[in-house]
UniProtKB/Swiss-Prot annotation:
Name by which UniProt lists this protein: NAD(P)H-quinone oxidoreductase subunit 2 A, chloroplastic
Reaction catalysis annotation: a plastoquinone + NADH + (n+1) H(+)(in) = a plastoquinol + NAD(+) + n H(+)(out); a plastoquinone + NADPH + (n+1) H(+)(in) = a plastoquinol + NADP(+) + n H(+)(out)
Bilayer disposition of the protein: Multi-pass membrane protein
InterPro entries in UniProt: NADH-Q_OxRdtase_suN/2, ND/Mrp_TM, Ndh2_N
GO-annotated biological processes: ATP synthesis coupled electron transport; photosynthesis, light reaction
One example GO MF annotation: NADH dehydrogenase (ubiquinone) activity
Cited function: NDH shuttles electrons from NAD(P)H:plastoquinone, via FMN and iron-sulfur (Fe-S) centers, to quinones in the photosynthetic chain and possibly in a chloroplast respiratory chain. The immediate electron acceptor for the enzyme in this species is believed to be plastoquinone. Couples the redox reaction to proton translocation, and thus conserves the redox energy in a proton gradient.
Stored PANTHER family: NADH DEHYDROGENASE
Keywords, comma-separated and alphabetical: Chloroplast, Membrane, NAD, NADP, Plastid, Plastoquinone, Quinone, Thylakoid, Translocase, Transmembrane, Transmembrane helix, Transport
Source organism per UniProt: Platanus occidentalis
Length: 510
């Protein structure tokens, strides 16, 4: 009898929760229509996986890619609409947030074809992989539009939990398990630090959680210049720093990059930085409006440390993925310059443009690592020697992406860095820009060192891995080459038409 009563209560409670969720989607669904498309795609993936056999695997890729493309289309149709606040102030939709959401969706769309061959060769579970990627994408999109402290905490946790599972996806690999453990422990610690910072912000503002209401609360309580705000700023900067992985919050990055499956690293290397950058700009600009000098100083220190340590340590690496890990630490230092400049002098427009180029440059490089690793089973930089003699397309596309990452003209990376540094120079960040220029020269050195290995034709330098190199007979090889071609084109051609891209970003933002 008691069991029946408890069961009936559970059914009633579940029905109420479902009806409330349905009511929210019915009245607020138009505000999060791109996110709803991904949710529908997730449900469809689960239904197909539970009712089908192995023959329907191509449908899983098709549904995932289609839901991402449809979500991008929905965002484009909603472009430049009036800003909207929904879900009782928890979520905000505007052009600034939608640009970052577009970048996250673009990353995920490119990562799925990049992963097809790797999944087939390693016999990874396909459905779960796609579910985690789409759910992480969903968490990143919600983080971009988060308008209160609770959503800013919950959305990245949704992203982070999927990231932990993806990084440890190859359970039999000891390095993958080690990377996941470090990632999980440091991620949990950073989340605790972030919540502690939020608690100081919540208390100082008189119990407000919405970003704009926090500013009003700080004015009413006269706490905007109090020590509590400084403490909140430090803790929140450390918490967000884990997601952005600037130095000295970068310790997890090389190990996770090296131990995780390569398609997962490609996905995490760009989406986490895009989502964290969107969140950082909103948090620093709105609640810490009165502490701009303090957070500018903090971010300048992080940018300098990231650019110097990231690029110098990258020179010493022998693993391609570890080298890209330290390179990404240096790259986030350049992005922080745009965050510091802000609205003035087109800082946000230049930051967004550079991140768009960084997505193509980075994913193109990882596509090459996936392709080469599947054929040779190695990640060592020395083992790439002479690749041009066996696979000219792979070697040339790798060289173009690496040169663009280094910032050599006339590639997209050069013009992206040029505009970013010029905005920083106009804003008076002379020392920061000078460090950026010097470290860019350092990065060109280790990128050119890899390109020299790729193009070498001397037999004594060619390793057995390249001598025995064979192109994959799998039909899915076309998918990774497609991703690589798109990334190479996006890393080269946009440099020629830089001004229109910047103009579109400026016009959209302001």
């Amino acid at each position: 009898m008691i069991w029946h009563v408890q069961n009936e209560n559970f059914i009633l409670d579940s029905t109420r929760i479902f009806m409330k969720a349905f009511h929210l989607l019915l009245f607020h669904g138009s505000f999060i229509f791109p996110e709803c498309i991904l949710i529908f795609g997730l449900i469809l993936l689960l239904m197909i996986d539970s009712t089908s056999d192995q023959k329907d695997i191509p449908w899983l890729y098709f549904i995932s890619s289609t839901s991402l493309v449809m979500s991008i289309t929905a965002l484009l149709f909603r472009w430049r609409e009036e800003p909207m606040i929904s879900f009782s102030g928890n979520f905000q939709t505007n052009n600034f947030n939608e640009i970052f959401q577009f970048l996250i969706l673009l990353c995920s769309t490119l990562c799925i074809p990049l992963s097809v061959e790797y999944i087939e060769c390693t016999e990874m579970a396909i459905t779960e992989f796609l579910l985690f990627v789409l759910t992480a994408t969903l968490g990143g999109m919600f983080l971009c539009g988060a308008n209160d402290l609770i959503t800013i905490f919950v959305a990245p946790e949704c992203f982070s939990l999927c990231s932990y599972l993806l990084s440890g996806y190859t359970k039999r690999d000891v390095r993958s398990n080690e990377a996941t453990t470090k990632y999980l422990l440091m991620g949990g610690a950073s989340s605790s630090i972030l919540v502690h910072g939020f608690s100081w912000l919540y208390g100082s503002s008189g119990g407000e959680i919405e970003l704009q209401e926090i500013v009003n609360g700080l004015i009413n309580t006269q706490m905007y210049n109090s020590p509590g705000i400084s403490i909140a700023l430090i803790f929140i900067t450390v918490g967000i720093g884990f997601k952005l992985s600037p130095a000295p919050s970068h310790q997890w990055t090389p190990d996770v990059y090296e131990g995780s499956p390569t398609p997962v690293v490609a996905f995490l290397s760009v989406t986490s930085k895009v989502a964290a950058s969107a969140s950082a700009t909103r948090i620093f600009d709105i609640p810490f409006y009165f502490s701009s000098n303090e957070w500018h100083l903090l971010l300048e220190i992080l940018a300098i440390l990231s650019m110097i340590l990231g690029n110098l340590i990258a020179i010493t690496q022998t693993s391609m993925k570890r080298m890209l890990a330290y390179s990404s630490i240096g790259q986030i230092g350049y992005v922080i310059i745009g965050i510091i400049v802000g609205d003035s002098n087109d800082g946000y427009a230049s930051m967004i443009t550079y991140m768009l180029f960084y997505i193509s440059m980075n994913l193109g490089t990882f596509a090459r690592i996936v392709s080469f690793g599947l054929r040779t089973g190695t990640d060592n930089i020395r083992d790439y020697a002479g690749l041009y003699t066996k696979d000219p397309f792979l070697a040339l596309s790798s060289a173009l992406c690496l040169l663009s990452l280094g910032g050599l003209p006339p590639l997209a990376g050069f013009f992206g860095k040029l505009h970013l540094f010029w905005c920083g120079w106009q804003a008076g960040l002379y020392f920061l820009v000078s460090i950026g220029l010097l470290t860019s020269v350092v990065s060109i050195y280790y990128y050119l060192k890899i390109i020299k290995l790729l193009m070498t034709g001397r037999n004594q330098e060619i390793t057995p891995h390249v001598r025995n190199y064979r192109r994959s007979p799998l039909r899915s090889n076309n998918s990774i080459e497609l991703s690589m071609i798109v990334c190479v084109i996006a890393s080269t051609i946009p440099g020629i038409s830089m001004n229109p891209i910047i103009a579109i970003a400026q016009d959209t933002l302001f």
